[in-house]
UniProtKB/Swiss-Prot annotation:
Domain of life: Eukaryota
Similarity comment: family membership: Belongs to the ALS family.
Lineage of the organism: Eukaryota, Fungi, Dikarya, Ascomycota, Saccharomycotina
Stated name of the protein: Agglutinin-like protein 1
Leader sequence segment: 1-17
Length: 1260
C-alpha cells in the first residue's frame, strides 16, 4: 500500500510540473571585460557580462516548474561552471543549466527549474550575471554563416526572450583593427567538445587568384587535426570582424592528416577569397602552436610565399552569480471585482523581506469547450466568498475537406482555404501528373538487390531498374547404380537457387561406432566424395551428463566435455565470458534523464536503458536526385540536437578531385543549398610516395610534399639541418693517416675518425726521492713524439763528474695547461781522504786529498688544466762525487744545434690537435739553439808520472755553452674566419763559464824520470748551497666585442741578469756578496696591463787550485827535486734566485674579426764575474794562482776558473707534449747530458748514470 501511495504521489508531482515564462523580466546591463589582452572590444571576444533581472512568484510558480531563456547569437558561456542558482537572501529558488550553442545552434539557452524553497506565499526577485561570448562567425558552417550577420560595428540591440517576454539592451561593438586585405586567422574554444575551431583566410587578390596553397599544421605533436570536421570554400564578403558571411564551392585538391591540412587551388574569380577551417584537438587548448602555409599567386602578379607561425593562448573564465530579496505575500479574498495590493513598511537597506497583502476577488475556474462553428462565446456561473466561480469559454473550430488535383509542376503543393463565414475549410492538394513507367531487371556483381527509379521530365517515361545479385547455387551429390558420373544444372528464376545435381557411382564402406546425446541408437552413412570411402557411423546413447557453467577472463566461451567410461557420468564444463552490454537510449516526456540496467543470464546481453528528455531540433535543407521534395527527421543522441532534413531537387554540379587513404576511388556528391551549386567530390587512392632526405643550411627541419597527378608518384622532400660533428683521433698499425666520416641519421652527431700512424718515442730517465721506479708515457698529438719518462730511485754510488759541466731542461707541456715548477738543492757533505802512491823514480810521494759531495735535487711540478683539477709531480735526482785514481775520464759529445717548431689547435675540451687549413690557430712556437763544447777529463794526475809541469799551462780550459729559446704564440680567433696575428715571446739566455780541465793521460809506454818530492797533503773542501729560479710564462688573449680588429700592444721587456762575486784565501766559506737585479717592464699600450719584475741575487766564491800536468805519451821528462806544500783548496758556491713571471696577453675577437697580437719580447742575459786569490803561481790559461787577482765580466769569450752555481728552470707552455727542449744553464751539482739514439730521438741522462756508463765502458 505504501509503495502505491509513493508512486501515486510521484506521478502527481510530475504531472503537476509545468513550463512558465516571463521570469527574466529586465536586461539591466551588458559590459565587456578583456579576458586575454584583446586589441579591441569585439562581440566574439570574452567576456561580455550580461546582468539580467528575474522574479519568481510563489502563487504562479511551483517547485519543479521550468522556464527557459533563449539568447540568440550567443556562442557560449565563458565559465567553467555548468549551472547558476537564482538566489535571494542566500536561498536558492531556482537552478539554471548552461547550454552553449557553439557550432550546433545559432543561440544559447539557460534552462531553469524552480526549487522547493519557493512557497506560495513567497515572491523572490533579483539579478543574475551571465559571462558570455557572442557568435559573429568564424567558420564555414551554416551556424556561423547565419550568425555572422547578427551584428555590425557600432550600436546594436541585443535581445533575449523568456517565452513571449523579450528583454533588450543597446550595446556598442568595436570593429576589428586587423587589415582585412591581409591574411586572416582566428581560433575559438568549444568547451563542450574540448576542441578548437581554427580559421585561415587567404590574402586578398582584387583580380582573383591564378593558383595557391594554404593550410596549417603542427610539428610538435601536441595538436591533432579532425579531418572529418573541416570547411573549405570561397567567400564573397567579410563582416566587420573579418569572418566569412558566405561560402561557395570551388575546385581544389585537399590533403589532410592528423598533423595538418593543406589545399591547392586554381582560378578563383575576382571578388572571392578562399578560406579553410577545421576542428583541432590540442594537448592544452589554452596553449598550442600552428604553422601556416601561405603561398598564392594573384591574377596578373608574381607568386608570393609568406608562411608564418602563431602561438595561441587561452582566455580567463568568469563566474556567474545571482542575488536578490524575498517578498512574502499574504492573500485575503474580498467581493470586489478587481485585485488590490497593500505593501507593509519596508526599508531595503535593512530588511531582506518585503510583505505584500493582496486583496483578490472570488477565484474563478475557466472551462474551455469547443464546437463546430465560427464565433467564441463566454458564460459565467457566480459563487459566494469561499467558493469558486466558473467561466465557460466555447471556442469554435472548423472542419476541412480535401480536394486533390494533378498539375504540370514537378512538386506537390498543399493549400488551405479558410472559410470566414462557414465552419468547413478546403484543403487543395496539387500533385504532379505521373509519367508512365518501364521496369528493367538485370543482374550485377554485388551481393544485394537494388531498385533505382530514373524520373523523366513531366510527359516522359520513368524507368525502374531492378538489379539482382546472381542466384545462389546448391550442389547435390548422389549415388546411382551406374558406373559413371553425371552433372545436371537446374536453373531457378532470379532470386531463387540454382541446383547442380552430381550423380556418382557407389563408394566402398567403413563402419564406426560412437556415442551421442540421444537416448536411442542410430546408424548414419557418411558418403565420401566419388572415389572415396563411405563411412557408416553407429551412434549409441551417451552417459549421463553433469553440466557446470562458470565465468572466466577470456572474451570468448568454451565448452569442454570430459567423457567417462561407458556407464559413468560425463562432465560438460561451460566457460562463459562476461556478458556484453547493449545501451539503448530513448526519449520520454520528463525533463530529466534516468539510467536503468537490466541484467541478462550468462551468455546473454545486459541492457542499459537511458531515458533522456527530448532534444532541440535543427532543420537542414539539402538536395537529392529526385524532382520532388521530402522531409526526414534524424534523431540525435540524448542532449543532442535532432535534425530535420528537407531534400530538394538537385543543383548544378562542380567536380573536385582529392586523395584519401583507401586503395580504391569513390565519388561523393556534396549538395549545396537550394539555388546554389553541388560539389562532386572524387576521392582517388593516394599516389605512391618517394621520400628524399637532404641537408640544408638552416637550423630547423622542414618537410615538403610535391603532389603528382592521380596514378603517379608524390615526392616528400625532407630538409634536415646539418648534424653536429665529433672528431676522434686514434692510432693504428699502418704507416699512413686516414680520415673517415661516419654520417649519423638527421638530428644525430656525425663522427670524423682520424687514424694516425704511431708516434716516435723519446725515453727520458730521471731520478727522484722515492725508493721505487715508475714509468710514465706522455702521448703527444698525431705527428708528434711520445715521451716515456722513467723515474729511478737515488743511488749511493760514487760517480765522477765535473761540477762545471751542467745542463738544465726547459720542461715542455701543451697548452692550455699552466705549470709551476720548484727546484730545491739540498747538499750533504761527506769528506774522506786518500793517499795515492805515484811512481816517479823517486822515494817521494805525491799525495791527493779528495772531498766527496753528495747533492740531492728535488723538483715539484704542479699542472692545472683550465682552472679545474691540478696535479702535482715531484722528482729528485743527482749524486756528485770527485773521481779517485781508479776512475776514468768522462767525455761529453758536442750536441749539435736543435731547432723545433710546432703549432697546435686548442679545442674547447682542452685537447690539443694539429691545425689544418682555414682553422684558427693558437699555440707556442719554440726554437732552441744549443751549442756545447766538448769537455775532456783525465784520471788523477797523481796516478801517473808527469814529464813536464809546463805542459799544463797549454791545455785548453774553457767550456762554453749558449742557449736561446724563442716562444711564438699564434692568436686565437674564436669566431672569425681569419688567423689572428701572433704573439711572440723571446727569451735569450747567454751563459759564460770557465772550466779547468785536467791534463792528458800519459800513455803506458812513457818513460818517466823524477826527482824525489816531498808532498804535504792539505784538505780540500767543496761546499755548495743552491736555490732555484722559477720562471712562469703565461699567455692569454683579450677579447674584442664586435668582431673588429683589436688594437695591438707591443711591450718589449728586457731581462738582464748579472752576477758579481769575489773570494779570498782568508775566508773560504763566505765571500763578499753583491746582488744583481733583473727587471721586466713592458711599455704600456692600450690593452696592456702587464708589469713583471725579476730579481736574481747570486754570490759565488770559488778558490780553485790548478793541478799538475801529466806527461804525454812518448815524452822523456826529467824533473828536479821539489819540496812542495800543497795549499788547501776551498770551493764555495752560494746561489740565491727569485721567481720570474712573464705574461703575454693576446686579443680575442668574439665575432669573427682579426685580432692583432701583443708582442712581448724578453731578453735574458746571464753573465758571471769573479775574483779569486790563492797561494799559488799564476797560470796564463785563465786559472787564478799565486795570489794575483783576475776578474771576468759579462763576456762570453773570457774564461776564469770560477763556477757559476745559478740553476734556472723555465716553465714555458709549448704546443706539443712530444717536443723536448734542452738548454744549458749554470748548475752547481747536477749534470744532465743529452745524446742522440740514432733515430732523431734525444735521450737524457743524469750525471751519475752517464759517468757510470763511461766507467763501465773502460773496463769492457
Amino acid at each position: 500500500m505504501l509503495q502505491q501511495f509513493t508512486l501515486l504521489f510521484l506521478y502527481l508531482s510530475i504531472a503537476s510540473a509545468k513550463t512558465i515564462t516571463g521570469v527574466f523580466d529586465s536586461f539591466n546591463s551588458l559590459t565587456w571585460s578583456n579576458a586575454a589582452n584583446y586589441a579591441f572590444k569585439g562581440p566574439g571576444y570574452p567576456t561580455w557580462n550580461a546582468v539580467l533581472g528575474w522574479s519568481l512568484d510563489g502563487t504562479s510558480a511551483n517547485p519543479g516548474d521550468t522556464f527557459t531563456l533563449n539568447m540568440p547569437c550567443v556562442f557560449k558561456y565563458t565559465t567553467s561552471q555548468t549551472s547558476v542558482d537564482l538566489t535571494a537572501d542566500g536561498v536558492k529558488y531556482a537552478t539554471c543549466q548552461f547550454y552553449s550553442g557553439e557550432e550546433f545552434t545559432t543561440f544559447s539557452t539557460l534552462t531553469c527549474t524552480v526549487n522547493d524553497a519557493l512557497k506560495s506565499s513567497i515572491k523572490a526577485f533579483g539579478t543574475v550575471t551571465l559571462p558570455i561570448a557572442f557568435n559573429v562567425g568564424g567558420t564555414g558552417s551554416s551556424t556561423d554563416l547565419e550568425d555572422s550577420k547578427c551584428f555590425t560595428a557600432g550600436t546594436n540591440t541585443v535581445t533575449f526572450n523568456d517565452g513571449d517576454k523579450d528583454i533588450s539592451i543597446d550595446v556598442e561593438f568595436e570593429k576589428s583593427t586587423v587589415d582585412p586585405s591581409a591574411y586572416l586567422y582566428a581560433s575559438r574554444v568549444m568547451p563542450s567538445l574540448n576542441k578548437v575551431t581554427t580559421l585561415f583566410v587567404a590574402p586578398q587578390c582584387e583580380n582573383g587568384y591564378t593558383s595557391g596553397t594554404m593550410g596549417f599544421s603542427s610539428s610538435n605533436g601536441d595538436v591533432a587535426i579532425d579531418c572529418s570536421n573541416i570547411h573549405i570554400g570561397i567567400t564573397k564578403g567579410l563582416n566587420d570582424w573579418n569572418y566569412p558571411v558566405s561560402s561557395e564551392s570551388f575546385s581544389y585538391t585537399k590533403t589532410c592528416t592528423s598533423n595538418g591540412i593543406q589545399i591547392k587551388y586554381q582560378n578563383v574569380p575576382a571578388g572571392y577569397r578562399p578560406f579553410i577551417d577545421a576542428y583541432i584537438s590540442a594537448t592544452d587548448v589554452n596553449q598550442y602552436t600552428l604553422a601556416y602555409t601561405n603561398d598564392y599567386t594573384c591574377a596578373g602578379s608574381r607568386s608570393q610565399s609568406k608562411p608564418f607561425t602563431l602561438r595561441w593562448t587561452g582566455y580567463k573564465n568568469s563566474d556567474a552569480g545571482s542575488n536578490g530579496i524575498v517578498i512574502v505575500a499574504t492573500t485575503r479574498t474580498v467581493t470586489d471585482s478587481t485585485t488590490a495590493v497593500t505593501t507593509l513598511p519596508f526599508n531595503p537597506s535593512v530588511d531582506k523581506t518585503k510583505t505584500i497583502e493582496i486583496l483578490q476577488p472570488i477565484p474563478t475556474t475557466t472551462i474551455t469547450t469547443s464546437y463546430v462553428g465560427v464565433t467564441t462565446s463566454y458564460s459565467t456561473k457566480t459563487a459566494p466568498i469561499g467558493e469558486t466561480a466558473t467561466v465557460i469559454v466555447d471556442v469554435p473550430y472548423h472542419t476541412t475537406t480535401t480536394v486533390t488535383s494533378e498539375w504540370t509542376g514537378t512538386i506537390t503543393t498543399t493549400t488551405t482555404r479558410t472559410n470566414p463565414t462557414d465552419s468547413i475549410d478546403t484543403v487543395v492538394v496539387q500533385v504532379p501528373s505521373p509519367n508512365p513507367t518501364v521496369s528493367t531487371t538485370e543482374y550485377w556483381s554485388q551481393s544485394f538487390a537494388t531498385t533505382t527509379t530514373v524520373t523523366a521530365p513531366p510527359g516522359g517515361t520513368d524507368t525502374v531498374i531492378i538489379r539482382e545479385p546472381p542466384n545462389h547455387t546448391v550442389t547435390t551429390t548422389e549415388y546411382w547404380s551406374q558406373s559413371f558420373a553425371t552433372t545436371t544444372t537446374v536453373t531457378a528464376p532470379p532470386g531463387g537457387t540454382d541446383s547442380v545435381i552430381i550423380r556418382e557411382p557407389p563408394n566402398p564402406t567403413v563402419t564406426t561406432t560412437e556415442y551421442w546425446s540421444q537416448s536411442f541408437a542410430t546408424t548414419t552413412t557418411v558418403t565420401a566424395p566419388p572415389g572415396g570411402t563411405d563411412s557408416v557411423i553407429i551412434r549409441e546413447p551417451p552417459n549421463p551428463t553433469v553440466t557446470t557453467t562458470e565465468y572466466w577472463s577470456q572474451s570468448y566461451a568454451t565448452t569442454t566435455t570430459v567423457t567417462a567410461p561407458p556407464g559413468g557420468t560425463d562432465s560438460v564444463i561451460i566457460r562463459e565470458p562476461p556478458n556484453h552490454t547493449v545501451t539503448t537510449t530513448e526519449y520520454w516526456s520528463q525533463s530529466y534523464a534516468t539510467t536503468t540496467t537490466v541484467t541478462a543470464p550468462p551468455g546473454g546481453t545486459d541492457t542499459v536503458i537511458i531515458r533522456e528528455p527530448p532534444n532541440h531540433t535543427v532543420t537542414t535543407t539539402e538536395y537529392w536526385s529526385q524532382s520532388f521534395a521530402t522531409t526526414t527527421t534524424v534523431t540525435g543522441p540524448p542532449s543532442g540536437t535532432d535534425t530535420v532534413i528537407i531534400r530538394e531537387p538537385p543543383n548544378p554540379t562542380v567536380t573536385t578531385t582529392e586523395y584519401w587513404s583507401q586503395s580504391y576511388a569513390t565519388t561523393t556528391t556534396i549538395t549545396a543549398p537550394p539555388g546554389e551549386t553541388d560539389t562532386v567530390l572524387i576521392r582517388e587512392p593516394p599516389n605512391h610516395t618517394v621520400t628524399t632526405t637532404e641537408y640544408w643550411s638552416q637550423s630547423y627541419a622542414t618537410t615538403t610534399t610535391v603532389t603528382a597527378p592521380p596514378g603517379e608518384t608524390d615526392t616528400v622532400l625532407i630538409r634536415e639541418p646539418p648534424n653536429h660533428t665529433v672528431t676522434t683521433t686514434e692510432y693504428w698499425s699502418q704507416s699512413y693517416a686516414t680520415t673517415t666520416t661516419v654520417t649519423a641519421p638527421p638530428g644525430g652527431t656525425d663522427t670524423v675518425i682520424i687514424r694516425e700512424p704511431p708516434n716516435p718515442t723519446v725515453t727520458t730517465t730521471e731520478y727522484w726521492s722515492q725508493s721505487f721506479a715508475t714509468t710514465t708515457t706522455v702521448t703527444a698529438p698525431p705527428g708528434g713524439t711520445d715521451t716515456v719518462i722513467i723515474y729511478e730511485s737515488m743511488s749511493s754510488s760514487k760517480i765522477s763528474t765535473s761540477s762545471n759541466d751542467i745542463t738544465s731542461i726547459i720542461p715542455s707541456f701543451s697548452r692550455p695547461h699552466y705549470v709551476n715548477s720548484t727546484t730545491s738543492d739540498l747538499s750533504t757533505f761527506e769528506s774522506s781522504s786518500m793517499n795515492t802512491p805515484t811512481s816517479i823514480s823517486s822515494d817521494g810521494m805525491l799525495l791527493s786529498s779528495t772531498t766527496l759531495v753528495t747533492e740531492s735535487e728535488t723538483t715539484t711540478e704542479s699542472i692545472c688544466s683550465d682552472g679545474k683539477e691540478c696535479s702535482r709531480l715531484s722528482s729528485s735526482s743527482g749524486i756528485v762525487t770527485n773521481p779517485d785514481s781508479n776512475e776514468s775520464s768522462i767525455v761529453t759529445s758536442t750536441v749539435p744545434t736543435a731547432s723545433t717548431m710546432s703549432d697546435s689547435l686548442s679545442s674547447t675540451d682542452g685537447i690539443s690537435a694539429t691545425s689544418s687549413d682555414n682553422v684558427s690557430k693558437s699555440g707556442v712556437s719554440v726554437t732552441t739553439e744549443t751549442s756545447v763544447t766538448t769537455i775532456q777529463t783525465t784520471p788523477n794526475p797523481l796516478s801517473s808520472s808527469v814529464t813536464s809541469l809546463t805542459q799544463l799551462s797549454s791545455i785548453p780550459s774553457v767550456s762554453e755553452s749558449e742557449s736561446k729559446v724563442t716562444f711564438t704564440s699564434n692568436g686565437d680567433n674564436q669566431s672569425g674566419t681569419h688567423d689572428s696575428q701572433s704573439t711572440s715571446t723571446e727569451i735569450e739566455i747567454v751563459t759564460t763559464s770557465s772550466t779547468k780541465v785536467l791534463p792528458p793521460v800519459v800513455s803506458s809506454n812513457t818513460d818517466l824520470t823524477s826527482e824525489p818530492t816531498n808532498t804535504r797533503e792539505q784538505p780540500t773542501t767543496l761546499s755548495t748551497t743552491s736555490n732555484s729560479i722559477t720562471e712562469d710564462i703565461t699567455t692569454s688573449q683579450p677579447t674584442g666585442d664586435n668582431g673588429d680588429n683589436t688594437s695591438s700592444t707591443n711591450p718589449v721587456p728586457t731581462v738582464a741578469t748579472s752576477t758579481l762575486a769575489s773570494a779570498s784565501e782568508e775566508d773560504n766559506k763566505s765571500g763578499s756578496h753583491e746582488s744583481a737585479s733583473t727587471s721586466l717592464k713592458p711599455s704600456m699600450g692600450e690593452n696592456s696591463g702587464l708589469t713583471t719584475s725579476t730579481e736574481i741575487e747570486a754570490t759565488t766564491t770559488s778558490p780553485t787550485e790548478a793541478p799538475s800536468p801529466a806527461v804525454s805519451s812518448g815524452t822523456d821528462v826529467t824533473t828536479e827535486p821539489t819540496d812542495t806544500r800543497e795549499q788547501p783548496t776551498t770551493l764555495s758556491t752560494t746561489s740565491k734566485t727569485n721567481s720570474e713571471s712573464v705574461a703575454t696577453t693576446q686579443a680575442t675577437n668574439e665575432n669573427g674579426g682579426k685580432s692583432p697580437s701583443t708582442d712581448l719580447t724578453s731578453s735574458l742575459t746571464t753573465g758571471t764575474s769573479a775574483s779569486t786569490s790563492a797561494n799559488s803561481e799564476l797560470v796564463t790559461s785563465g786559472s787564478v794562482t799565486g795570489g794575483a787577482v783576475a776578474s771576468a765580466s759579462n763576456d762570453q769569450s773570457h774564461s776564469t776558473s770560477v763556477t757559476n752555481s745559478n740553476s734556472i728552470v723555465s716553465n714555458t707552455p709549448q704546443t706539443t707534449l712530444s717536443q723536448q727542449v734542452t738548454s744549458s744553464s749554470p748548475s752547481t751539482n747536477t749534470f744532465i747530458a743529452s745524446t742522440y739514439d740514432g733515430s732523431g730521438s734525444i735521450i737524457q741522462h743524469s750525471t751519475w748514470l752517464y759517468g757510470l756508463i763511461t766507467l763501465l765502458s773502460l773496463f769492457i
